[in-house]
């Protein structure tokens, strides 16, 4: 499972914000600020490509009227304010994995940027801030790649770390010379972070239409107007793709995808993905495209020895959810614990309507907060919950979970399985 996760291609859907001082600095010229941001992304993309990560710019916002937070020279205060704004305002408007603020302000001391360590995919902490500290956009791009590196679990390099050139991207001190490589330590940090946390948001590939920056032929990502993209003509090894034009070579039907083989579509009915479990189905090619469309068993089909019902290709049961939250020995609490969900307080509720927590009706108590018994020597409390004010949804019973015979959770209610 871990190896499969590590091998999977990762995608960071990036949102960039430029503050009001940036807008003034570039002569109140929106096009100039945008071009600066696009140039920066075009430097970041190949840096992360070497780490099996594609960085796609899915959003860009320029604060051309006034700042939406109080940007100040204290970097840690500004980072906290930016992260809170992202969590409470930006995320509800535009889905993305990571946000970085580019500011024209001078931070105190030698700081050129700041980012939360290991924050990727977290509602509250997948963010960084960077000072537009140099006219050379390569150096600013490397500073953003550095803060994103922190978000992706990389710490500062120690003296023993190397990337063949000195310094590397995660060096603790900003360098005047551009370095486009991560050190051996950074790669190890990142790998260990991925294995430990398995962040899910970066597995989702963005749509071509999600990308807001102009298409760049040679960045390994097929964008609007391209048929394929295998990198530069110098590095491309794909016989199906013309690297200079990002168009398919003559006679080729496709260049990549689970239903593409030697530049041709695989035949209709060819299996392209085996069934993962009893709620999944084997996926097959259509013979007309490279897509391997995900199919699964109908919702409501019994699974896991009748302990659950299939829901969107998975079999969510409370026992597994308790193990995921509290460790391998955890079990589901007794029914009496679930009565706390009738209180409608800050953690015990069934759903939220316009940010108001709605208490569970008696028949719905098993569709609110999940109660578990950790079964560990240090915790003998029979009614435990997982609750984090930064991510209140984590620790709720998952949609589709069996809550009674013939019933499953939907929007905080225990309803008939149809």
Curated annotation (Swiss-Prot):
Binding site for Ca(2+) 2: 280-281, 283, 294-295
Enzyme category, top tier: hydrolase
GO cellular component: extracellular region; plasma membrane
Active site: 147
Entry EC number(s): 3.4.24.-
InterPro entries linked to this entry: ADAM_Cys-rich, Disintegrin_CS, Disintegrin_dom, Disintegrin_dom_sf, MetalloPept_cat_dom_sf, Peptidase_M12B, Reprolysin_adamalysin
Co-factor binding comment: Binds 1 zinc ion per subunit.
Binding site for Ca(2+) 1: 216, 219, 221, 223, 226, 229
Domain Disintegrin: 214-299
A Gene Ontology molecular function term of the record: toxin activity
Pfam families referenced in this protein's UniProt entry, alphabetically: ADAM_CR (PF08516), Disintegrin (PF00200), Reprolysin (PF01421)
Placement of sequence motif D/ECD-tripeptide: 278-280
Expression sites by tissue: Expressed by the venom gland.
Domain Peptidase M12B: 10-206
GO biological process, one term: apoptotic process
Functional description taken from the UniProt entry: Snake venom zinc metalloprotease that induces apoptosis in vascular endothelial cells (VEC), without degrading the extracellular matrix (it cannot cleave collagen) or inhibiting adhesion of VEC. Has also fibrinogenolytic and hemorrhagic activities.
Record family assignment: Belongs to the venom metalloproteinase (M12B) family. P-III subfamily. P-IIIc sub-subfamily.
Record's subunit section: Homodimer; disulfide-linked.
Protein's UniProt name: Zinc metalloproteinase-disintegrin-like crotastatin
Organism: Crotalus durissus cascavella
């Amino acid at each position: 499972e871990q190896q499969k996760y590590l091998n999977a291609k990762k995608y960071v859907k990036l949102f960039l914000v430029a503050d009001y001082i940036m807008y003034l600095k570039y002569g109140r010229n929106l096009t100039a600020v945008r071009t600066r941001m696009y140039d920066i992304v075009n430097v970041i993309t190949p840096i992360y490509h070497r780490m099996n990560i594609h960085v796609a710019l899915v959003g860009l916002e320029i604060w051309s009227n006034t700042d939406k937070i109080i940007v100040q020279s204290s970097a840690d205060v500004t980072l906290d304010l930016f992260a809170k704004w992202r969590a409470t305002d930006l995320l509800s408007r535009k889905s993305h994995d990571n946000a970085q603020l580019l500011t024209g302000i001078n931070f105190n001391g030698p700081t050129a940027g700041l980012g939360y360590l290991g924050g990727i995919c977290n509602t509250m902490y997948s963010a960084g801030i960077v000072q537009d500290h140099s006219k050379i956009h390569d150096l600013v791009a490397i500073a953003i790649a550095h803060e994103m590196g922190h978000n992706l679990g990389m710490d500062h390099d120690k003296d023993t770390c190397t990337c063949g050139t000195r310094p590397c991207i995660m060096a603790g001190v900003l360098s005047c010379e551009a370095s486009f490589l991560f050190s051996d330590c950074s790669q190890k940090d990142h790998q260990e972070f991925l294995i430990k946390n398995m962040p899910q948001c970066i597995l989702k590939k963005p749509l071509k239409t999600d990308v807001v920056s102009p298409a760049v032929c040679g960045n390994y990502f097929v964008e609007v107007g391209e048929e394929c993209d295998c990198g530069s003509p110098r590095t491309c090894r794909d016989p199906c793709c013309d690297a200079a034009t990002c168009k398919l070579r003559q006679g080729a039907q496709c260049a990549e995808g689970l239903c593409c083989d030697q530049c041709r579509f695989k035949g209709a009915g060819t299996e392209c993905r085996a069934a993962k479990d009893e709620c999944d189905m084997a996926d097959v090619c259509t013979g007309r495209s490279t897509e391997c469309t995900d199919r699964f068993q109908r919702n409501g089909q019994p699974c896991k020895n009748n302990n659950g019902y299939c829901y969107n290709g998975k079999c969510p049961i409370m026992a597994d959810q308790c193990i995921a939250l509290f460790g391998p020995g955890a079990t589901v609490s007794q029914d009496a614990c679930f009565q706390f969900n009738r209180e409608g307080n800050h953690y015990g509720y069934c759903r939220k309507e316009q940010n108001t927590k709605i208490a569970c009706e008696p028949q719905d108590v098993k569709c609110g907060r999940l109660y578990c018994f950790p079964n560990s020597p240090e915790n003998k409390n029979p009614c435990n919950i997982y609750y984090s004010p930064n991510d209140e949804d984590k620790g709720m019973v998952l949609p589709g979970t069996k809550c009674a015979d013939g019933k499953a959770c939907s929007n905080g209610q225990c309803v008939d399985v149809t």
